[in-house]
């Protein structure tokens, strides 16, 4: 049986067992990603898109090939629909600023009442400057978007809807294609915060008719500081640049500069070349695994959910049995602080997340303080889940 952990130095080099269940926050890096970054700095370092010498030409070619890999992974039609950014937050802010500087000014954006801060604050800040309005669509008790309420809001006139593909708190999965159809029926556009969706397997954004999609490389086993904003080509062409600098302008004129076509229009300055190469290596790695990433994570999430249900008094936030769930479970144990559980689990070599998960609106929606979240990555297996649940049960016995 293939041992995925052997591909990751963080697990190979531990003297004591280390169970990492916080991949919703960030994923560890396989050796091939680390090698791609260090090889670039050690043997092929040069800038991209700016010089004619061979080292620059070679690395520029490698850099652009990663756009093709990303496009294939997410199901984009064109490489030019892939804009490199610093991460999901950067992508959403880029889109919010550019849209509010053009066709969104004075209009209306809809987000859900349970979004990550990145998909609320980016819109609220940009819309406040342009005079646009942000409205919130309700979610049900499992965290699933209330489509009838969304339609009611759309009938009032909306330019853009921005929703999470997978909630980082509840794990609720957005029915993307169904939502896209509804949003487009009323003449609006759909943007997706894909931070928790991109790592669960290849996507089909063009088939789902998604207009914009944002994600971070570090949640796809790639380095930090690199992300992607996908946008349909014609929509990216409709947006103005939000940063000025090298390589995003064709002809400078103090009155009427002519800017590059997307994606370069949105990539001012020297990019995070090492991060891009690491992102390409991460996608290569995932595609070469001898099993389906999606099937593995779906089955393991189901196993985690069912094992957690065996713990007395436990409350699992979000979708219940039979409803699609992203690869995470947030839990509450009445009378026990999530931060205490996280601290005690760390003492047993188990890393989980405790807190509000950078989503205070979601905490308010379910009237929660903090939750304990276990989230899965490609390197996790059933034994990790068993060890986590047994450690949790052992800790809880001391409270009773």
Swiss-Prot record:
Give the active-site positions.
358 (cysteine persulfide intermediate)
One GO term in the molecular function aspect is: pyridoxal phosphate binding
Please provide an example of a Pfam family that matches this protein in its UniProt record. Aminotran_5
E.C. no? 2.8.1.7
Family annotation (InterPro entries) = Aminotrans_V_dom, Aminotrans_V_PyrdxlP_BS, Cys_dSase_SufS, Cysteine_dSase, PyrdxlP-dep_Trfase, PyrdxlP-dep_Trfase_major, PyrdxlP-dep_Trfase_small
Key word Electron transport present: no
PROSITE patterns with a match to the protein in the record: AA_TRANSFER_CLASS_5
Required cofactor names: pyridoxal 5'-phosphate
Q: Which domain of life is it from?
A: Bacteria
Instruction: Give a yes or no for keyword Cell cycle in this entry.
Output: no
Q: Which reaction does it catalyse?
A: (sulfur carrier)-H + L-cysteine = (sulfur carrier)-SH + L-alanine
**Which EC class does it fall in?**
transferase
Q: Give residues where N6-(pyridoxal phosphate)lysine occurs.
A: 219
Q: Which GO terms describe its biological process?
A: cysteine metabolic process
Q: Which UniProt keywords apply?
A: Pyridoxal phosphate, Transferase
| Transmembrane domains' residue ranges | none
Give the similarity note: Belongs to the class-V pyridoxal-phosphate-dependent aminotransferase family. Csd subfamily.
Which NCBIfam families does this UniProt record tie to the protein? sufS
Against PANTHER family, the record matches this protein to: CYSTEINE DESULFURASE, CYSTEINE DESULFURASE 1, CHLOROPLASTIC
Role this protein plays: Catalyzes the removal of elemental sulfur and selenium atoms from L-cysteine, L-cystine, L-selenocysteine, and L-selenocystine to produce L-alanine.
* Protein name (Swiss-Prot/TrEMBL): Probable cysteine desulfurase
Q: List the source organism.
A: Chlamydia muridarum (strain MoPn / Nigg)
Q: What lineage, starting at the top, does this entry show?
A: Bacteria, Pseudomonadati, Chlamydiota, Chlamydiia, Chlamydiales
Q: Which gene encodes it?
A: csd
């Amino acid at each position: 049986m293939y041992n995925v952990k052997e591909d990751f130095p963080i697990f190979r080099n531990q003297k004591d067992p280390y169970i990492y269940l916080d991949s919703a926050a960030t994923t560890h890096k396989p050796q091939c990603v680390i090698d791609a970054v260090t090889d670039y700095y050690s043997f092929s370092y040069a800038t991209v898109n700016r010089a004619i010498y061979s080292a620059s030409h070679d690395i520029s070619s490698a850099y652009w090939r990663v756009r093709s890999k990303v496009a294939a992974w997410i199901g984009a039609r064109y490489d030019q629909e892939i804009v490199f950014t610093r991460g999901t937050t950067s992508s959403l802010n880029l889109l919010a600023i550019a849209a509010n500087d053009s066709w969104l000014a004075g209009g209306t954006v809809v987000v859900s009442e349970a979004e990550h801060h990145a998909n609320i604050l980016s819109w609220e800040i940009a819309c406040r400057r342009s005079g646009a309005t942000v409205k919130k669509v309700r979610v049900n008790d499992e965290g699933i978007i209330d489509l009838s309420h969304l339609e009611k809001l759309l009938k009032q006139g909306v330019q853009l809807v921005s929703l999470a593909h997978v909630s980082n708190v509840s794990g609720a999965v957005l029915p993307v294609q169904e939502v896209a159809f509804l949003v487009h029926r009323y003449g609006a556009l759909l943007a997706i915060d894909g931070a928790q969706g991109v790592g669960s397997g290849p996507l089909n954004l063009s088939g789902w008719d998604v207009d914009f999609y944002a994600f971070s490389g570090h949640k796809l086993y790639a380095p930090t500081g690199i992300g992607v904003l996908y946008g349909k080509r014609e929509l990216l062409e409709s947006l103005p640049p939000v940063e000025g600098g090298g390589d995003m302008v064709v002809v400078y004129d103090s009155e009427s500069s002519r800017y590059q076509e997307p994606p370069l229009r949105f990539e001012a300055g020297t990019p995070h070349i090492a991060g891009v190469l690491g992102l390409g290596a991460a996608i290569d790695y995932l595609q070469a695994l001898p099993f389906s990433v999606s099937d593995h994570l779906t089955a393991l999430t189901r196993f985690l959910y069912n094992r957690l249900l065996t713990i007395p008094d436990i409350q699992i936030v979000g979708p219940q049995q039979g409803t699609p769930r992203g690869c995470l479970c947030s839990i509450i144990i009445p009378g026990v602080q999530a931060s205490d559980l996280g601290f005690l689990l760390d003492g047993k070599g188990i890393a989980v997340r405790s807190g509000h998960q950078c989503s205070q609106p979601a905490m308010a929606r379910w009237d929660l303080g903090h939750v304990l979240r276990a989230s899965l990555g490609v390197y996790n297996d059933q034994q990790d889940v068993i060890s986590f649940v047994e450690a949790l049960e052992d800790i809880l016995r001391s409270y009773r």
